[in-house]
Regions:
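Two-component histidine phosphotransfer core
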Residues: 1-47, 51-228, 238, 242
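C-terminal end segment of the histidine kinase catalytic
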Residues: 229-254
Length: 254
């Protein structure tokens, strides 16, 4: 009987150890997701008053020259910030992130001129409902507008989102702007280069947002995911985001 008791005790102890390990792993995963959601909420809370002023000033100028256009912009502006606040989860469908990026461009086109900022979006239909972190495309497009626009030709921005193999997606944002040297491109996602910017919709600025994108992608999607910048002075810039969905810390349901 004692041998049986010892065997039962050993089995129970082993089971308890396994259960404790599983609970610890689960708790770690929960904490990772809570951290991810907190980071998104922090971005949402950073609504910059200067961007608010500049956009409302643009709308006000249209009230004198084109009241109908002013009304449309005001309605779109309301939708933009409502969507920003509504994206309370860490993950949103690709289609929603693209829609929010288009709203952002609406204000930049109104500010600089419809013929000065041109954009195309090429998104595979089969991944429109794929869940991605909020604020991964719009800040990159914002950075292209801020730093890519020159004094001559219109700025063209091409956004594409496609599958990259069976379990990954590739987000590409390319522009024909002024470009940047190798050192500047290497620092684009660097924490040390993240500086507040008064013209950014998110108060931390595009630099902070760009660094945040890189941090979240590597943290959420593992070592096989990456952020890459291809650029040269006078040759435009392309930003690539590779998201390995198979290594996501989230339980993604498509």
């Amino acid at each position: 009987p004692r041998a049986v008791d010892r065997t039962q005790y050993a089995l129970a102890s082993g089971f308890a150890e396994i259960l404790s390990t599983q609970l610890a792993i689960h708790e770690l995963e929960v904490q990772k997701e809570l951290t991810a959601r907190a980071e998104v909420r922090a971005l949402q809370a950073q609504i910059n008053p200067h961007f608010l002023f500049n956009t409302l000033n643009t709308i006000a100028s249209f009230t004198r020259t084109d009241p109908l256009r002013a009304r449309e912009l005001l309605r779109e502006f309301s939708s933009f910030y409502r969507a920003t606040l509504d994206n309370s989860g860490s993950l949103i469908p690709v289609s929603r992130e693209v829609a929010q990026t288009k709203r952002y461009l609406t204000f930049e086109k109104a500010r600089f001129g419809e013929d000065r900022v041109l954009a195309t979006f090429d998104v595979s239909e089969d991944i429109e409902d794929t869940l991605v972190p909020a604020f991964v495309i719009q800040p990159i497009v914002e950075n292209a507008v801020r730093h890519g626009m020159g004094d001559g030709d219109a700025l063209r921005i091409d956004v594409s989102v496609h599958r990259d193999g069976e379990d990954a997606i590739l987000i590409a944002v390319a522009d024909n702007g002024v470009g940047m040297d190798e050192g500047t491109a290497a620092r684009l996602f660097d924490e040390r280069s993240a500086r507040p910017d008064a013209n950014s919709p998110q108060g931390g600025g595009a630099g902070v947002a760009m660094h945040n994108i890189s941090e979240r992608i590597h943290r959420f999607y593992g070592p096989h995911s990456y952020t890459r910048v291809e650029s040269a002075p006078g040759k435009g810039t392309k930003v690539l985001l590779h998201l390995d969905l198979s290594e996501s810390i989230f339980d993604i349901q498509e």
